[in-house]
């Protein structure tokens, strides 16, 4: 009996290592919005992060020998961000451990990673509709004319234009007409990393790369919110990275494996992003014609 328990314990450690490795890799490659925005680590012992925001200042012409006529007031507003725990639990039976099947452990890890990535990404996507500025409307087309206008307005109003994110079915409407025209352009250096590059549509309009995210949900009118923003418009606050916890359940003859993280998604600067409400109906009919 002692020998069996030792074997099971060793298999559990091996299983945990495989699952966590696969979960981390899968998560990193399945949350495009999280990879596009600023990541901030919360210092140990701190409950929340306070970010001061100072209003735009104006520089003035000076006259030699004369004092400044104008002075700028510093009246910062504060954006506060907090984190909360998010996790997932998997019950691993002794029988599964005895089989010692690495493929099964890898599949479990992938599913755990996909679940955590989906949770983080949808938390970040939920910020899109909260921006004060919004372009588009229900059933409006995500086409070249409309999105070119969005970019022009965003630049005119000093809204961030580091990236655009929308649902693949919205971007699909534009892709066939502009790929040949814009295919020679490349991504900015800041986004030249695998987890982000994988979600680039291949389109860049007026210097703004367009990314796809299938986690964006639609409303009853087949429309949904994307975003045009700078990296610092939204933030991903990390209070604690992945931690693994195990608890033995003898009646189940199994071990509960719990993965927990503590993080928060927050809007850092309302003036640096805008919501994009555009249509993305099912492409099934067009794809089969």
Predicted regions located by residue number:
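Short helix/loop capping segments that flank catalytic or ligand/cofactor-binding pockets
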Residues: 59-62, 100-101, 173-176, 266-268
């Amino acid at each position: 009996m002692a020998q069996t328990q030792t074997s099971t314990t060793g298999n559990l450690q091996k299983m945990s290592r495989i699952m966590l490795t696969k979960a981390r890799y899968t998560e990193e490659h399945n949350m495009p919005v999280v990879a596009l925005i600023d990541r901030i680590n919360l210092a140990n012992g701190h409950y929340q992060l306070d970010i001061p925001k100072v209003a735009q200042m104006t520089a003035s012409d000076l006259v030699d020998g004369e004092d400044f006529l104008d002075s700028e007031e510093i009246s910062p507003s504060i954006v506060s961000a907090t984190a909360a725990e998010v996790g997932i639990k998997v019950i691993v039976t002794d029988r599964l451990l005895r089989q010692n099947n690495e493929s099964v452990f890898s599949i479990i890890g992938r599913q755990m990673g996909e679940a955590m990535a989906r949770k983080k990404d949808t938390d970040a996507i939920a910020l899109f509709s909260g921006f004060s500025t919004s372009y588009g409307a229900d059933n409006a087309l995500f086409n070249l004319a409309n999105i070119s206008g969005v970019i022009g307005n965003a630049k005119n109003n000093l809204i961030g234009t580091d990236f655009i994110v929308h649902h693949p079915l919205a971007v699909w409407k534009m892709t066939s007409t502009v790929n040949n025209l814009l295919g020679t352009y490349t991504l900015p250096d800041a986004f030249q990393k695998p987890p982000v590059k994988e979600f680039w549509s291949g389109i860049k309009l007026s210097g703004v790369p367009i990314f796809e995210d299938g986690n964006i949900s639609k409303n009853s009118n087949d429309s949904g919110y994307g975003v045009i923003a700078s990296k610092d418009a939204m933030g991903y606050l990390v209070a604690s990275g992945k931690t693994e916890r195990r608890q033995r359940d003898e009646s189940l003859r199994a071990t509960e494996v719990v993965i927990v993280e503590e993080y928060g998604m927050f809007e850092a600067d309302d003036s640096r992003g805008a919501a994009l409400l555009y249509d993305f109906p099912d492409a099934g009919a067009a794809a089969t014609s």
